[in-house]
Amino acid sequence: MKSSHFDEYDKTLKQAELAIADSDHRAKLLQEMCADIGLTPEAVMKIFAGRSAEEIKPAERELLDEIKRQRERQPQHPYDGKRPRKPTMMRGQII
């Protein structure tokens, strides 16, 4: 049977593995959010590089809020139930 000393290490190791997985998931979500609003990876690096956790959390929250606002403004299906119109130059032409 393992001693309690090894149990503490196992517990710490499992917590570290979960933290790494959460960090990877958070980084992936952040990349997707930045891509949605048109930020390049270089711009994201400049925004978040050298910042403390206290500065990063509000910035990520603001980024998430901005993405939510943009998604609410955009219709899900712009031509839902309507036929798309031809461009102005092509109206009246038979193809």
From Swiss-Prot:
The protein's name: Low calcium response locus protein G
Region (Disordered): 65-95
Basic and acidic residues bias spans: 65-82
Keywords, sorted A to Z: Plasmid
Gene Ontology biological process terms, A to Z: negative regulation of gene expression
Gene name of the record: lcrG
A family per Pfam: LcrG
UniProt entry tagged with the keyword Acetylation: no
NCBIfam families, sorted: LcrG_PcrG
Keyword match Mitochondrion: no
Domain of life from the UniProt record: Bacteria
